[in-house]
Amino acid sequence: MAKGLRCKHRIRMRNIKRQHYAKKDLERLKKIVSKSSELKDVVTMKTTEPIQENKTSEGTSTDGSMEVDKMAKVINKKTLQDENGHYPEWMNQRAVKKQKQKLNKLKIKKKSGKVSKAIKW
């Protein structure tokens, strides 16, 4: 397909804009380089060797036991709620709403003590 006049005009305008911003960008980069060369004398860089040695010495333990901070959540299989009454993170709001309706039906059925008269297949 051929390119339209509007498309060609937009391409030309983008090229002009690119050239215009290239000048500003070049000046900005030159300023950054000059500042970084001035700061190079002030800043002292650390080598990675001592840092890595510290990590390896801290990471290894002699007894070989691990400390576990997080306790496993206890979830009720029937209600799918944890001990605080919250649903799991992976469960979306629609599923939570559906689960609550299901639990309410069970509560009503349990309170009335009657079995529904609907035909069960």
UniProtKB/Swiss-Prot annotation:
Residues 45-64 have a biased composition (Polar residues). The keyword Translocase does not apply. It is found in: Cytoplasm; Secreted. It comes from the Eukaryota. GO terms for cellular component: cytoplasm; extracellular region; nucleolus. Induction: Up-regulated in the somata of the procerebral neurons after associative conditioning with paired presentation of a carrot juice odor and an aversive quinidine taste. This is 18 kDa learning-associated protein of slug.
